[in-house]
Amino acid sequence: MDHRDTNTNMEALREVLRYKNEVAGHGFLFDDGDLVWREEDDATWRRLYDVVNALISSKRMQRVLYMDLSITKGEGHLLFVDLQGTKNRLYKEPRFRRHLILIEDFLAYPR
């Protein structure tokens, strides 16, 4: 993946998180439209992108993850939740995958 792809994907991820925060009321990076964590050179976004990338298990899951991802910030951890299943039988009985990631671990991701 070249640098342009990464930037495009990070921008798409930003849009997803803006939507999730403003419309669905989840997310941890935005508070009244402003970034809560500010870092130089988008380091937080790069690490967030790496974490989300690590959660994607296949091309099919990528669509589901981006559509149904929520991220919440708790006491010392981030909780990533993604919905398994698309418009099939799982759609009627969805299963959620939860990924708990310590903020210390998140901040330790390579820049």
From Swiss-Prot:
Lineage: Viruses, Riboviria, Orthornavirae, Negarnaviricota, Haploviricotina
Protein name: Non-virion protein
Functional note: Plays an essential role for the viral pathogenicity.
Domain of life: Viruses
InterPro entries xrefs: Rhabd_NV
Gene from which the chain derives: NV
Protein family: Belongs to the novirhabdovirus NV protein family.
